[in-house]
C-alpha cells in the first residue's frame, strides 16, 4: 500500500469545521469514558528561539490507526508552528499518511477551545472577547460562532493593525460586529466568554 501525502493547501480544502466539531466532541467523550493509550509529549529547546515537540501516540476508539505528530514552534515566523503528522496502521505500524500539521494543529486547538467554552459558559453568553489576533484567535472565534449565536465580539492584540484587520475580516466573514479594542481590559469588559490566543505574558 502506498503512503498518502497531504500538503497544507489540501488539508485546508478538505477539512470541514462542523464535521471536525462533531468528531472532536465525540473524541473527548470517548477519552473520558473509556481506557485510552496514554499519550506522551516530548519537548526540547532548539538553538535560538525555536522549540521542537513530538506528540505520540494519538488514538481513538474504533480507528485502527495511531498518529505521531512532530512539530517546531518559532514565535517570530508565520506560521509559527510547522510540522507533520504521521498516521500509522495500529496492527502493523505501516505508514498510511503524512500530513502537514500546521492547519490541523490550529483547527484542533481552536475547536477544542470553542467546545470547552460552549460546555462551560452560561447559555446566555453571547458577547465574546479574543486576546490575540493571530491564527488561533481567528480559529477560536470562527469555531465558537459555529456553535453559538454571537451578538458581538471584541479583539485586542499588541499589534493594533493586526487587531484592526482581524475585526474587519471576521466582521465580514461571520456577519457580526467585531471591534478592535485599545487594551485587553477594554476587550474583556462585559464579555461573557474570553478566549486567550497569544504567547504574550
Give short role names for the model-derived ranges.
Residues 144:
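Aromatic pocket-lining residues of Rossmann-like dinucleotide-binding sites
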Residues 147-173:
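NAD(P)-binding Rossmann-fold cofactor-contacting core
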Residues 1-106, 114, 121-124:
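N-terminal ligand-binding/catalytic initiation module
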Residues 133-134:
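Glycine-rich Rossmann-fold phosphate-binding loop(s) that bind the pyrophosphate
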Residues 175-201:
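Rossmann-like adenosine-cofactor binding region
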Residues 137-138:
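N-terminal Rossmann-fold NAD(P) dinucleotide-binding loop
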Residues 120-127, 149:
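Short helix-loop-beta connector
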Amino acid at each position: 500500500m502506498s503512503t498518502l501525502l497531504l500538503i497544507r493547501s489540501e488539508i485546508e480544502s478538505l477539512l470541514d469545521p462542523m464535521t471536525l466539531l462533531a468528531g472532536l466532541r465525540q473524541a473527548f467523550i470517548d477519552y473520558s469514558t473509556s481506557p485510552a493509550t496514554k499519550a506522551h509529549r516530548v519537548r526540547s529547546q532548539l538553538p535560538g528561539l525555536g522549540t521542537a515537540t513530538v506528540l505520540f501516540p494519538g488514538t481513538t476508539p474504533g480507528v485502527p490507526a495511531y498518529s505521531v505528530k512532530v512539530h517546531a514552534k518559532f514565535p517570530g515566523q508565520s506560521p509559527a508552528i510547522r510540522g507533520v503528522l504521521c498516521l500509522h496502521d495500529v496492527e502493523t505500524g505501516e505508514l498510511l499518511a503524512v500530513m502537514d500539521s500546521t492547519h490541523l494543529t490550529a483547527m484542533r486547538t481552536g475547536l477544542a477551545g470553542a467546545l470547552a467554552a460552549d460546555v462551560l459558559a452560561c447559555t446566555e453568553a453571547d458577547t465574546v472577547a479574543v486576546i490575540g489576533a493571530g491564527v488561533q484567535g481567528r480559529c477560536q472565534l470562527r469555531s465558537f460562532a459555529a456553535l453559538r449565536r454571537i451578538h458581538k465580539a471584541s479583539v485586542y492584540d499588541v499589534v493594533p493593525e493586526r487587531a484592526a484587520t482581524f475585526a474587519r475580516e471576521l466582521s465580514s466573514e461571520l456577519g457580526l460586529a467585531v471591534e478592535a479594542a485599545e487594551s485587553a481590559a477594554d476587550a474583556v469588559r462585559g464579555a461573557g466568554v474570553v478566549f486567550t490566543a497569544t504567547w504574550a505574558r
